[in-house]
């Protein structure tokens, strides 16, 4: 399963969707199919489209802020295998806040996180993930410049590499899922 945490998911354009809760694949599919939806981030739109084209392979969901994700996971058993994490938010969240939210997610999950952001943030993000508190999570973090041609393929290739070379990534979520279902 893949989860986007990105404020550019255009769910707030429709009053009948709650942009503070989980946005499931059906809602994302609606947003993609509705011609009136204004996707300000075409890279995120294309990534969602590609994921939704393979429903047997991918389960997709989204949140419009890391705080909404953290709130949701405190009340619900939810652990995506991959998070596509945007660094900047129009809500005015400072880099420090984005950094703390990322650290909270890393500490409370076993999720692989692709920080997928604009070029002007990449150097700052790379400096953040080199900090001592992030070093132990380096195998679960990858920084990708959203504006790089083929950036979506870099994420897909990164996921495929983890599936092939990392036992925990390949089987860990199945074990955790089955354990949670048994409880």
Model-identified regions with their sequence ranges:
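Extended charged low-complexity segments that act as oligomerization/scaffolding linkers
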Residues: 1-183
């Amino acid at each position: 399963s893949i989860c986007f945490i990105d404020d550019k998911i255009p769910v707030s354009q429709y009053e009948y969707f709650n942009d503070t809760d989980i946005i499931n694949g059906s809602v994302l599919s609606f947003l993609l199919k509705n011609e009136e939806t204004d996707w300000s981030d075409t890279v995120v739109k294309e990534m969602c489209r590609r994921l939704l084209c393979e429903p047997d392979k991918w389960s997709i969901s989204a949140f419009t802020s890391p705080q909404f994700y953290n709130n949701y996971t405190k009340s619900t058993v939810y652990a995506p295998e991959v998070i596509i994490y945007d660094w900047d938010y129009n809500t005015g969240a400072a880099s420090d806040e984005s950094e703390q939210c990322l650290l909270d997610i890393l500490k409370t999950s076993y999720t692989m996180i692709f920080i997928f952001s604009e070029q002007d943030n990449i150097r700052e993000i790379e400096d953040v993930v080199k900090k001592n508190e992030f070093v132990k999570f380096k195998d679960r973090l990858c920084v990708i410049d959203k504006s790089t041609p083929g950036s979506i393929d870099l994420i897909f290739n990164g996921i495929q590499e983890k599936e092939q070379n990392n036992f925990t990534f390949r089987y860990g979520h199945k074990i955790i899922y089955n354990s949670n279902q048994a409880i």
